[in-house]
Amino acid sequence: MILGDDECNINEHRFLVALYTSRTLFCGGTLINQEWVLTAAHCNMEDIQIKLGMHSKKVPNEDEQKRVPKEKFFCLSSKNYTLWDKDIMLIRLDSPVKNSAHIAPLSLPSSPPSVGSVCRTMGWGRISSTKETYPDVPHCVNINLLEYEMCRAPYPEFELPATSRTLCAGILEGGKDTCVGDSGGPLICNGQFQGIASWGDDPCAQPHKPAAYTKVFDHLDWIENIIAGNTDASCPP
């Protein structure tokens, strides 16, 4: 996923989960309480397995746990999200997890993010912009929260709207970015969980081609309503 930085510290990503189908790790996600994971809608697949407390794909942690989805919730039909809107999915685990050395939830944000913030993102995604090279352990990188227009202007072919519930983040000179396999993972700005990795350019980490993240703060009411049992809750327009 992550280009341009190093392996995450084993103790800094207790909330990071890995989504597998068969034996393939295809997305990340974020544990937000003992029973719920937040990820991207485009990470919806059949037969998802969720690994929690994982660092190395080859050498399991003693407290690593596996779950499967009990329920999945979307703002819209899972096929109706767009590049700029509603790429968000809530997964209820089939049984709760307990906090442990390598498992603990990340709380939802208490305030919206500010442009200019330094944000950290992470995942097991590709670590080469041109080769199918995937790491054994998650990589972490610091990037900047940018004006939304910085994601709109470089991609005229997507016809992105003038405003959106999407965050734009990256390094304008390139070299640091999320990449294939990082989707669904967290964007953490000033210590708060603000974004869900949604989409970016391919090849990754090109100059003036930052990536887009679903804005968690704008979806708080929907998230909290679903968790509280109000499954008819609607997302922000």
UniProtKB/Swiss-Prot annotation:
Regulation acting on activity, per entry: The hydrolysis of TAMe (tosyl-arginine methyl ester) substrate is activated by Ca(2+), Fe(3+), Mg(2+) and Zn(2+), and inhibited by EDTA, PMSF and DTT.
GO molecular function list: serine-type endopeptidase activity; serine-type peptidase activity; toxin activity
InterPro entries for the chain: Peptidase_S1_PA, Peptidase_S1_PA_chymotrypsin, Peptidase_S1A, Trypsin_dom, TRYPSIN_HIS, TRYPSIN_SER
Any one biological process term the GO annotation gives: proteolysis
Active site (catalytic residues): 42 (charge relay system), 87 (charge relay system), 183 (charge relay system)
EC identifiers of the protein: 3.4.21.-
Positions of the Peptidase S1 domain: 2-228
Disulfide bridges in this chain: 27-43, 119-189, 151-168, 179-204
Presence of the UniProt keyword Secreted in the record: yes
Glycosylation-annotated residues: 80
Biotechnology note: Has potential to be used as a thrombolytic drug due to its fibrinolytic, fibrinogenolytic and thrombosis-reducing activities without concomitant hemorrhagic activity.
Reported tissue expression: Expressed by the venom gland (at protein level). Expressed by the venom gland.
Entry note: thermal dependence: Optimum temperature is 37 degrees Celsius for the hydrolysis of TAMe (tosyl-arginine methyl ester) substrate. Thermolabile. Activity is reduced about 50% after incubation at 50-55 degrees Celsius for 30 min. Loss of activity after incubation at >60 degrees Celsius for 30 min.
Localization in the cell: Secreted
Superkingdom of the source species: Eukaryota
One GO location term (cellular component): secretory granule
Keyword Aminoacyl-tRNA synthetase set for record: no
Proregion span(s): 1
Keywords: Disulfide bond, Fibrinogenolytic toxin, Fibrinolytic toxin, Glycoprotein, Hemostasis impairing toxin, Hydrolase, Platelet aggregation activating toxin, Protease, Secreted, Serine protease, Toxin
Functional note: Thrombin-like enzyme that shows fibrinogenolytic activity against bovine fibrinogen alpha and beta chains, but not gamma chain. Hydrolyzes fibrin. Enhances ADP-induced human platelet aggregation. Has arginine esterase activity for TAMe (tosyl-arginine methyl ester) substrate. Reduces thrombin-induced thrombosis. Does not have hemorrhagic activity. Reduces the motility of human liver cancer HepG2 cells in a wound-healing assay.
Family: Belongs to the peptidase S1 family. Snake venom subfamily.
Protein name, as recorded: Thrombin-like enzyme agkihpin-2
